[in-house]
Amino acid sequence: MGIQAAEISAILKDQIKNFGQEAEVAEIGRVLSVGDGIARVYGLDNVQAGEMVEFPGGIMGMALNLENDNVGVVIFGSDRDIKEGDTVKRTNSIVDVPQGDELLGRVVDGLGNPIDGKGPINAKLRGVADVKAPGIIPRKSVHEPMATGLKAVDSMIPIGRGQRELIIGDRQTGKTAIALDTILNQKSYNDAAGDDESKKLYCVYVAIGQKRSTVAQLVKKLEENGAMEYSIVVAATASDPAPMQFLAPYAATAMAEYFRDNGRHALIIYDDLSKQAVAYRQMSLLLRRPPGREAYPGDVFYLHSRLLERSAKLNEDFGAGSLTALPVIETQGGDVSAFIPTNVISITDGQIFLETELFYQGIRPAVNTGLSVSRVGSSAQTKAMSSVAGPVKLSLAQYREMAAFAQFGSDLDAATQQLLNRGARLTELMKQPQYSPLTNAEIVCVIFAGTNGYLDKVALADVGRWEAGLLQHLRGKHAELLAWITNEDPKIKDDAAGRVKAALDEYAATFA
């Protein structure tokens, strides 16, 4: 077979023409030492603070300490396969996460990777995890209600869209239960809103340092109640490395900010920030940053303030969206004056204080109504609710004061006796089983009944039964009254009070 020169030259010409001249340039460094999830890297001279770097085997890390002769990198994953002398590559990108509606109904880790086995998330947008909070100009004061469906909270500690309300208490006092009920309560509002995005509320739940079984149970509960369709769960569990637990709240906030910045409304629950602070303390000490009070680093206040300041109500010029935050803090033995609790109390717009004592007395949710406050929520309360909630606060405050004195004296005058009786019944009325949130109108009617003496003759043990019967009666025979309160939002006095009283009188006559 002869050599065909023309054909060979044609092939050579073709190859020369298509010769790629691009050379891939990557800035690399070498691992000096590695251990406890921290790598010291030499040679990454131009790396930025907070930049992602890549180790062999695709393990990612984040540059946190930029020192004269080396870079301190925290590792998102196991450091077992990283050894001294390994090459580390810059990625030239600050830590970012996927954003958008594609995340709804999914469970992701602290970097936005799916961990629910439902395939990849094809998000079109990505956002930087740790961005600056909105300034003063884009904001507006909180004025729309964010209903939790809990009688004790919606009446006495109202929360508005764009508010930060801390849920604080010892372990096993029902902190997560309040947060979960709030998510479940949005189902009826979101379904009623139809296509009106301004009425819907999307929920993001961040589990920080919790057991995997606990997170799985929570996701199952959300799925059973049809709440996953408007929720995102971000999980950095106890078995995840500290950097993941530190990063998860920021990543989740970036996902929630997508809704805030597009004129929609979102709620984010951080469960819980005590564990994030512990993870950050671990990272800081291993990076040899100087410890401060309780061995936390000096910037632990900034850790939480820059996170919670991202929750805001934006004004009309910026789309009128909002991001509401419910951070959870676990106290040790009811000590609210510890470092982290005092920090977060000073950052937030109020707190729901839960007590072990009340929990064991069977008062659940175990809200201490005396210590709990909402600093901005009252302006977001519906007219109907604020008109019935005032007397409750007063009655319960007087009851707590009198109950303390009543232990000493046996012969009490009729007025004091009446005050104690009503206070006991109102306390009983504030109890609510888990996973059974009520609508705004139902809470208004129940509380109106309590403050207007409908329960004074009912035995204390029968209050729960009386309330359950009333709700059934209202839903069955007075659905139009509930709809009227929901849609018109009247102040419950004069004519409106007359309509509610008529329904209550009708029920009271049948109760036995």
Swiss-Prot record:
Main location: membrane
Pfam families (UniProt xref): ATP-synt_ab, ATP-synt_ab_C, ATP-synt_ab_N
SUPFAM superfamilies in the cross-refs: C-terminal domain of alpha and beta subunits of F1 ATP synthase, N-terminal domain of alpha and beta subunits of F1 ATP synthase, P-loop containing nucleoside triphosphate hydrolases
Chain residues that bind ATP: 169-176
Top class in the EC scheme: translocase
Site annotation Required for activity: residues: 372
Keywords annotated in UniProt: ATP synthesis, ATP-binding, Cell inner membrane, Cell membrane, CF(1), Hydrogen ion transport, Ion transport, Membrane, Nucleotide-binding, Translocase, Transport
GO cellular component: plasma membrane; proton-transporting ATP synthase complex
Catalytic activity: ATP + H2O + 4 H(+)(in) = ADP + phosphate + 5 H(+)(out)
Function: Produces ATP from ADP in the presence of a proton gradient across the membrane. The alpha chain is a regulatory subunit.
Quaternary structure and interacting proteins, as annotated: F-type ATPases have 2 components, CF(1) - the catalytic core - and CF(0) - the membrane proton channel. CF(1) has five subunits: alpha(3), beta(3), gamma(1), delta(1), epsilon(1). CF(0) has three main subunits: a(1), b(2) and c(9-12). The alpha and beta chains form an alternating ring which encloses part of the gamma chain. CF(1) is attached to CF(0) by a central stalk formed by the gamma and epsilon chains, while a peripheral stalk is formed by the delta and b chains.
HAMAP family: ATP_synth_alpha_bact
Name by which UniProt lists this protein: ATP synthase subunit alpha
Provenance organism: Ruegeria pomeroyi (strain ATCC 700808 / DSM 15171 / DSS-3) (Silicibacter pomeroyi)
Taxonomic lineage from the root: Bacteria, Pseudomonadati, Pseudomonadota, Alphaproteobacteria, Rhodobacterales
